[in-house]
Structure formats: C-alpha cells, structure tokens
Amino acid sequence: VLILSYNVYTGYRLKDKMEAVEIRVDTMSSFIKDMENDIEKAIFIVGFRSLLSLEDYMMKYDKFYGIDPEDLGITFNNAFDEVFRQGTINSVTMSLMKNNTFVYWTNKMSEQANKTNIILNFTVNSVTISQTEPWMVDIKVDLRINATDKKNAASWIIDKDFTKKINITGFVDPLYLVNNDGKVNNTIRKTPINPSASTSNLETHMVNSYYIEHN
C-alpha cells in the first residue's frame, strides 16, 4: 500500500510539474509575440526621429553627409546607424533622441520582462536604411533575442530581421538643407496632379514644388 501510494503521489507531482512548465512555456510564447510587435513599433518611432535628427544635423553644420573634406565626415548610413542606436551623430547628442534610442527601448523591454521572471537580452547585429519605393524608406534591424525563464523552464534564441517602412512625404528635401542659410525648406509632397497632362497642371506642379516619383 505504501509503495502504491508513493507511486501515485510521485505521478501527481510529475503531472503538476509538467503542467506548470507547459503553462510557463505558453506564457513566454505569448510574451515573445507581444515583444516582437513592440520591437516593430520601436523601430518605427526611433527610425522616424532618427531621420528628423539627421536633417537637424545637416542644417546645423550646413554640410552633406559624406567623408570628403567638404562633407560632414560621416556617411549617411553610418550616421543613421549611430543615431538610431545611441542618439548621437559624430558623438554629438541629438535632442530628439532623448529616451528614444533603440537601445533605450530594448532596455525598457528587458526591464518589463524581468518583472515576469524572464531574462531578456538583445544583440543588434546591424541597422540599415534603404529606399525600395519612391515614397518609402525601409529600416531593417538584424537582431538576436535571447529570452530565458529565471527557473530555466524554457528559453528562446531568435535571430530575425525586423523591417519597418517610413513614409518620407513631409520630410524636408535634403538638397534644400545645405547652402541656403535656412531660407528655403522644401518639404517632400507627392503631386496630386499629372504635370504632363497640360500646361496648367505643369505650372501648378512647379509653383507648389510638388514631387513626382521616378523609378
């Protein structure tokens, strides 16, 4: 009778433990899904502010991005990477990026994870910006995510490229940011008309400094 009772007790304990682990795995799985959505939102917010900061930096120093002597001494891609991650360009702190860098957002996510007994670590392998459509830029973050339950019930290692698109309409055309003493800032606005349809349309297009896509 004692042996039977022990076996039954052990069986129940094992079952309870397995159910607890299963619940924990489901909880972590839901957390990971929510976290991935938060990462995409963070990329959009940080990416948008990074583009504005790049404009501000150009206007402040009145130069284009590049490594030639007459340029800013940093390429556009490297400047974007730096400001996106750290909130600086050429080590100059950009005010728009205060509490809005990607590192800041991932640290906040790790803090939230810790409250639910999850150890969350991020490794940013690369940050790139490219233009694949006339009115959009793509922000791609190559990320490694390591999520581990504090009791070692479950763990995830995720290697993933996260990409968000940002519409560039409304941003200032970079060509107008340099060598004009801040007198002319032409924003990118998609033309609502066909400028080639008539002389009147062409005049309207030119007077309003509209933009037309060109592939």
Segments from the language model and where they lie:
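Long, compositionally biased, intrinsically disordered regions
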Residues: 5-215
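Glycine-centered recognition micro-motifs in short, flexible terminal segments and loops
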Residues: 1-2
